[in-house]
Every structure is written in C-alpha cells, then in structure tokens.
C-alpha cells in the first residue's frame, strides 16, 4: 500500500466504494487501499518479535511481517493454521512476543477464554494488539456489506456481534491480565487500535 498524500487523497475520494459498495477484492484494480491493508498498516509498527495472529483470515499480516503464525477456525487461504478452537492453541506457554486480534474479537463468542489463551502464550514483556469497530457502525456495515466474510460462512453465529464498545474491550482485557498502553483511531476515526501489555499484578 502506498502511504502518501496522493494515495490518501485517492482513498478519500473512493470512500463510498471502499467502505460500502465494492467487494474489497476489487479495490486494488482502482488503486484504492483495502480495509485489510489499512488495518495491517495501523498494526505493523506495534509488532515486535514473534507474532501470533488469531483470526488471521487470509494470513496477510503474517505473510507481510514474516515472523510468526496465523490461526483461524476457517480456511481462507494464505497459509494460516486452521484450528477447531482459538482458546486452546497448540503452542507452549510464553511462545510469542505479540498476539494480534484484528477486527475479529467481536466474532469470537468465547472472548474471555481467547484472551486468557493470549495471556498464556505471551512472554512477560509481550503485547496484545486489537482492532475494533463500534457496534453501531459494525451492525450497519454487516447488514450492507454483501461481500463480508460472515456472508461466506452462513451469516453471524450466536455470540457474535457487529462490533464492540471501547468499554467492553478494555474491561475484558483488564479481567484477563492486560493493561492498556495505547489507544488510537484510524480509517477516518471509525476503527480503534488498542495496544495492551501483560499485567503482572497478582
């Protein structure tokens, strides 16, 4: 993705197509940045060491970063490890320096269990990175995104939500052993990026 003023201007012109009307697979043909690219770009500068990407989808982040592994419960291509349960992963304790959940925590019904698993897998100096959209935008988006991944797997399942409020994300992470270090917005303020560190409080 070209990170330039010209690219940013072209992406802005294309907002209706990029964010609503067009399948994300079409955007590169028009020179527009996909949501997946924007999310990966927002996350990349916070990655360190060996990375585990939970809910990796097409495994774009790991294929770009090239030091880690992506896992998902669905096969989307790209080389991610397909698992039955992302709260019980086949890795030893403290195997990773960074765990990411990019635009997917709201799609995991057993969120607390997955965050506890992330805590188990992180080294003491590790960090957890989450991106999220709020439920109002998310519910509208999932209703109109005819190309959304949930449509390809039969729709939203019980326990999934269109998005999560910041208060929910922060509360869940605090309860599972994380402390917030950074929170910022991206993609015109509609997406949230949270960077947590492992909390060592007993």
PLM segments and residue spans:
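A conserved beta-strand element that flanks and buttresses the S-adenosyl-L-methionine
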Residues: 100
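Acceptor-substrate binding/catalytic loop of class I
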Residues: 146, 150-167, 185
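Conserved N-terminal segment of class I S-adenosyl-L-methionine
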Residues: 1-87
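Short conserved loop adjoining the S-adenosyl-L-methionine
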Residues: 88-93
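Core SAM-dependent methyltransferase catalytic element
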Residues: 176-177, 182-202
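A short glycine-rich, Lys/Arg-flanked "PGG" loop and its adjoining helix->strand segment in the class I
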Residues: 112-124
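Short catalytic micro-motifs in class I SAM-dependent methyltransferases
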Residues: 103-107
């Amino acid at each position: 993705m070209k990170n330039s003023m010209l690219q940013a201007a072209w992406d802005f012109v294309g907002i209706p197509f990029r964010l609503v009307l067009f399948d994300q697979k079409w955007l590169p043909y028009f020179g527009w940045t996909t949501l997946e690219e924007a999310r990966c770009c927002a996350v990349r500068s916070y990655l360190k060491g060996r990375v585990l990407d939970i809910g990796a989808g097409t495994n774009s982040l790991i294929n770009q970063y090239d030091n880690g592994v992506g896992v998902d419960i669905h096969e989307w291509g790209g080389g991610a490890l397909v698992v039955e349960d992302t709260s019980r992963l086949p890795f030893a304790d403290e195997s990773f320096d960074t765990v990411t959940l990019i635009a997917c925590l709201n799609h995991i019904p057993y969120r607390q269990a997955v965050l506890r698993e992330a805590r188990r897998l992180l080294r003491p100096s590790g960090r957890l990175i989450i991106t999220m959209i709020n439920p109002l935008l998310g519910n509208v988006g999932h209703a109109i995104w005819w190309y959304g991944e949930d449509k390809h797997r039969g729709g939203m399942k019980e326990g999934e939500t269109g998005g999560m409020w910041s208060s929910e994300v922060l509360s869940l992470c605090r309860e599972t052993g994380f402390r917030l270090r950074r929170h910022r917005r991206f993609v015109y303020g509609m997406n949230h990026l949270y960077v947590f560190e492992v909390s060592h409080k007993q």
